[in-house]
């Protein structure tokens, strides 16, 4: 990919630098960077006794003006995506929202990888969910899976937001609500941002309740597509704000959303 600028003749002109950006599932802007993120296999040095690799965040930083492209160092265990929420599951990030020099991102639980499924003798597999562990490789494209994985989350009635101190994503605070399911729209391998700030500094976190599409009831959310809020000046969910989108739309949900102006959003 490459970037463009408007020249003196008011024409779009390509910059000289061209970049082979690695695979990503979400993206956003922070300070001078266009950032991308995905979750993938970590270094072989971190393999467990079975040879299974942990999932880690794979980040890219494109500085358009300087025409530089860098990535994170996955030797740093701070980028570990495994057991990110304390329930054994790995996560992927959906959205990169810059707010007061921090990054807000939805942490979307993805289930147990081979690495997570075997950890501590399978301690993270909930009782009664043993049959959800895959017994062979299968699926295709973004829904492919490997033997030993427990694909998709066991906790569909939770929404987590990670608040990172800066673009390195190495230090964070996690906040949780059980009013909505995880906050992202999804199309194949892309996890769409559904967390946006209003002009007054409030942050609105939308969930389309994608987990309603899960085939197994144990992994299917019972929560409506809805929205919650993080009030300006706080880093917690507002306990007094919840809005069911389905209740106001005849049971309909949405795929994506964007901030327009003020506290208006387009879905």
Over which residues does each language-model region extend?
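Hydrophilic extracytoplasmic domains
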Residues: 9-18, 199-203, 207-267
